[in-house]
């Protein structure tokens, strides 16, 4: 949901993120915290994230230097290391130290300030 919003606002070709389950409630949907079935399973380690970034770039015919990778944990660092722009999002100190940009406050829409 969140990455789709950023994608649509910026006209980005492709985004990929975990998909969380939403349960219907009396007023609106609520996130359950459970993942919807995803081809990569519930756990996506650093090697898988890096592989998917490289495969996605190849499918789109772009260099990884044109990709943006955003993460918060050590398992995101391999993916962030091959992207042209690495963004630490409310990340652990080690990730913030290695990222090109750190977003420490606010929502995902803060990325718009970086890429516009």
What are these regions (language model features)?
Residues 1-116:
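C-terminal cap/substrate-recognition subdomain and adjoining C-terminal extension
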């Amino acid at each position: 949901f969140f990455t789709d919003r950023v994608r649509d606002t910026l006209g980005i070709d492709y985004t990929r993120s975990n998909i969380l389950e939403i349960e219907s409630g009396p007023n609106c949907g609520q996130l359950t915290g459970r993942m919807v079935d995803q081809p990569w399973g519930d756990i996506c380690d650093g090697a898988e994230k890096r592989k998917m970034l490289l495969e996605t770039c190849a499918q789109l015919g772009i260099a990884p230097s044109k990709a943006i990778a955003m993460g918060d944990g050590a398992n995101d660092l391999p993916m962030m290391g091959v992207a042209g722009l690495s963004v630490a999002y409310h990340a652990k100190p080690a990730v913030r130290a290695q990222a090109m940009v750190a977003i420490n406050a606010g929502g995902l829409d803060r990325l718009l300030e970086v890429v516009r």
